[in-house]
Each structure stands twice: as C-alpha cells, then as structure tokens.
C-alpha cells in the first residue's frame, strides 16, 4: 500500500512501483486521498488508476463534495471484487447518507461535464498566483522544479506550500494569516504551511493570499535563524520490539525528560498529517525527545501523549542506548 500524493502534494512514481510489485503478482493499493483531481489537466500528475490495482480517493478534499465522501476504484482483476463487496457489507453502515452519496454524484458530474473548462481556468489562476509571489524575500512558495528527484517524482501544483526563511515557525505563520488576513491554512509544519486549493477557488481568493504574503514579507527581517524542518522531525528510531508486542505489554508513564532509553508504548505524531514520529516498540532517544519538545514549543499539535510532559512506556524494557 502506498500513499501518493502526500499531504504536501509530493507524488510517487506509481508506474514504476506498480511494475515492481506486479512482477511478483502483488496487488498495489494507492491511498490517493489528496489526488481526486489528478488526470483532468496535463498540469497535474497522472491519476494512480492507470497503474494501481485499487485506488482510494477522498472526493471531498480537492473536489466540491461534502466532507466524509470518498470513492474506492477497483482497477484490475488482481483485486477480487466479490471479496471487496463482502467486507464492505461487514464494515459499511446499514444506514448510508443519501445526501453524501448525491453530493459525490453531483461533484463527479460537474467534472465530467465541464472539467476541461474548469481545470483550464484553475491552472491559469494557479499560474498567475505563483508568478505573483516569486519576488518574496523572507517567504517562499516552491514549485515542482524546487523538489529533487529523491524528494518526489512529481508535485501537485494545487498544493501551495508557504515556507519561512527567517526562523518563523509554520504555526506562527498560520496564526498571522488567520488573525490578520482571515485566511485559513490546511496544515502547519516546522517551517511551512500548506494552503489547499481547488477549481472552486476564485481570482479574488488567490489575490488575497498573494497580498497577505507580500504584506507579511515586507515586515519581516532576516533573523539569521532557521525553524526546524520536517527532515529534522522525521527520523528513523531504533526498534526494540514489534508494535503489537509493545501494545500488549505492561505499560507505565514517565516524564518526557526522564524517557531517554525507554521503549515507547504509544504512537506520537503531528496531526495533520498524522505521520508517526515515534511508534510503539521504538526506543526513545534524547534527540527524539528534544524534537517532541521543539514541536510543542513551536505550537504544533503533538498527539499521542497522555499529558504535555508525560509519555507512556513499556515497563521493564529500558535500554542503555549510550
């Protein structure tokens, strides 16, 4: 199973990955929650349905549909349709919302009937916005060419990443945009925010965002400091035991400053996007604890801790990692 695109709009090489797994007759499932708009215009990446065996798309994320609406696309005979129907019967509600289902149909009909015109206008608005913010000095709005091949195979231009270059945290940037300019961002991270767009956004909306960024940029100064980046946040801790073993073991709680060498009993993550920084069974190191602290101090939403300075650990599993 593969997530593509990411919350930030980074897209994997689904075609090549599919070729590898299909040579071993393994089905490929793609979580394309943020890519329901792919494939309607050449400016956007290809839709994963061309290569994967099953694709899940959250229609409500990038198309005009009600929250909670999504579709499951079965794309090859490697996935047993009857088996899928069996489990849908087990897990789906027996009282589905016809309002939500009608919303999906209306959204798909909209892009089916007028998608070419809608997406052409959308791409033009995105291009004009990106051109308007290239002169920013203390903020940056990356384009596809700003990502190396190692970071992403492709990039969704509909995701607007606004990166700080003067030490301001993503949380501070989001708060200013909301408080002073009534602009709500989708997500914050260490040194950037993500603005979600769709073909329903207007020229006026893109203009307001461009104006806000220029106004903020003009007031910023070069502090010589840098906010910690996502590369600092997501490291690969050492695993002491499997997650299920850690979850089934006896647990205790310790203060964060006393947790170095302990084995985590919980998932610790920022939400959004929900990618774990620490997984049950992994060894808590001093650098990892400092990253959790940095995230808290930056105002990011750290989930999984029972209290701000408390973490659940596996009893009698302490490791001397020095």
Where do the model's predicted regions map?
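Generic secondary-structure boundary signal with a strong preference for alpha-helix termini
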Residues: 21, 43, 119, 194, ...
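Conserved C-terminal alpha-helix-loop-beta "cap" of PLP-dependent enzymes
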Residues: 128-304
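Non-catalytic surface loops within mature trypsin-like serine protease
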Residues: 76, 166, 199, 315-317
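Charge-dense polyanion-binding interfaces
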Residues: 301-321
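Conserved PLP-enzyme active-site core in the AAT-like
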Residues: 1-145, 164
């Amino acid at each position: 199973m593969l997530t593509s695109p990411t919350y930030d709009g980074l897209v994997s090489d689904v075609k090549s990955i599919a070729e590898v797994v299909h040579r071993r007759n393994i089905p490929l499932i793609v979580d394309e929650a943020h890519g329901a708009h792919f494939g309607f215009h050449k400016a956007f990446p290809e839709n994963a349905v061309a290569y994967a065996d099953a694709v899940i798309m959250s229609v409500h994320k990038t198309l005009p549909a009600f929250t909670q609406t999504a579709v499951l696309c079965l794309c090859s005979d490697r996935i047993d349709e009857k088996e899928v129907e069996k489990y849908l019967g087990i897990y789906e509600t027996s009282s589905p919302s016809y309002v939500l289902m009608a919303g999906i149909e209306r959204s798909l009909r909209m892009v089916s009937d007028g998608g070419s015109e809608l997406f052409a206008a959308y791409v033009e608005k995105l291009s004009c916005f990106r051109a308007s913010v290239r002169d920013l000095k203390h903020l940056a709005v990356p384009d596809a060419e700003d990502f190396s091949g190692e970071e992403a195979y492709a990039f969704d231009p509909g995701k607007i990443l606004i990166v700080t270059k003067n030490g301001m945290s993503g949380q501070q940037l989001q708060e200013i945009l909301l408080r002073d300019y009534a602009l709500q961002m989708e997500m914050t991270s260490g040194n950037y925010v993500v603005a979600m767009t769709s073909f329903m956004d207007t020229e006026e909306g893109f203009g307001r965002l461009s104006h806000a960024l220029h106004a903020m940029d003009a007031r910023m100064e070069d502090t010589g400091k840098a906010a910690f980046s996502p590369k600092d946040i997501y490291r690969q801790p050492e695993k002491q035991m499997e997650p299920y073993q850690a979850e089934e073991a006896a647990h205790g709680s310790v203060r964060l400053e006393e947790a170095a060498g302990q084995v985590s009993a919980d998932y610790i993550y920022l939400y959004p996007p929900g990618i774990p920084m620490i997984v049950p069974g992994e060894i808590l190191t001093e650098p990892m604890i400092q990253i959790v602290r940095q995230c808290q101090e930056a105002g990011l939403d750290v989930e999984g801790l029972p209290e701000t300075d408390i973490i659940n650990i596996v009893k009698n599993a302490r490791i001397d990692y020095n």
